Amino acid sequence: MSGPVAITAASLRRAAEIVRGGGVVAFPTETYYGLAVDPFQPAALERLFAVKRRPADLPILVLVSGPEQLGLLAAGVPSLFTPLMRSFWPGPLTLVCPARADLPTRLTGNTGTVGVRRSPLAAANQLIAACGGPLTATSANLSGQPPAVTAAEAFALFGDSVDLVLDGGATPGGQGSTLVGVRAGRLCCLREGVVPFAAVQACVFSCADPSPFS
């Protein structure tokens, strides 16, 4: 690979071919550059973990085009997430749902859950559309190191260990997405990021009884 390529109809088609063939594509998201593989291909996930030097017990987040794709990944969607999807999607809020039993264990990290979000960034959604389904969205970094915020940084980090770097300009960096889950029927914050957990609580509080909070 000679370097990052601009996002065009042709490069998106090429990226989709790579992903469908089990390859790895770096692409921009609303926070950092991410690494996309087909989340349903175990071999592609193995390669993703090798590229990132990622510990095997850490799950991988997934981007979807909208709630209609949740059934491909989640065994069920907690009712507490309904107002959150309406208020914060598309946006940097990852919802951790019970995972379908047939998902690769590399994706879930044997947690029994899967984290999903819908990106507001056009380039990310164009890639999902070109690939025809959800994509992994783990940050473009070596495990434990800062993520890439530009295509040039992603290329410098990975070079030929990824198959394509899509250049969508600089990403904001800073905090990652906020992760929320439900435990014993109660909303919980697994990682606070761009979206304040207080705003998440307020959203659900305005639609339901306050008891679901922890």
Predicted segments — roles?
Residues 1-214:
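Active-site-adjacent structural elements in enzyme catalytic cores
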